[in-house]
Amino acid sequence: MAEHNEIGKIGENITKEFLVKQGFKILGQNYAIKQGEIDIIAEKDSTLYFVEVKSIKVRDCTNIENLVISPEDNLTLAKWSKLLITVETYLKHKNVPHETRYQIDLACVYIDTEMRQGRVKLLHNIYKEKE
């Protein structure tokens, strides 16, 4: 497995643990269609959360404020478009009622592989920011 794929999987696992500790119920992971993939699908307080995970390797995950690159930089317009299509497909495929509240969040994961730890910064409801 390529290192970036391995970092991505580690980031998804760290994010799942983070979400569970925050009271989320994990409904699924890596829901994929031809057009794209949703990394994590979760639920909390009657709201569905579609969580896109972007991870980067850092030397020190406790000091992320002055980094030149951040995980959210990896959410390109093309990836964003595919994510929106995949979310809409999921809602239809799973017959989710129209009145169900949902949002798309971005989990930015900073991974220190040497210290074997990570840090999650969760950006809420990025759909409004990207519209």
Feature annotation, model-predicted:
Residues 92-131:
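Domain-level recognition of nuclease-like catalytic cores that cleave nucleotide substrates
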Residues 2, 6, 10, 35, ...:
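Residues at secondary-structure transition points
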Residues 31-33:
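Mixed-charge, glycine-accented linear interaction segment located at domain edges/termini
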Residues 1-29:
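Acidic-basic catalytic patches of nuclease active cores, encompassing PD-(D/E)XK
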Residues 67-102:
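Mid-chain, well-packed structural core segment of small domains
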Residues 39-42, 108-110:
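Conserved protein-kinase catalytic-loop segment immediately C-terminal to the catalytic Asp
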Residues 19, 40-66, 83:
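Conserved catalytic cores of phosphodiester-cleaving nucleases, focusing on short active-site segments
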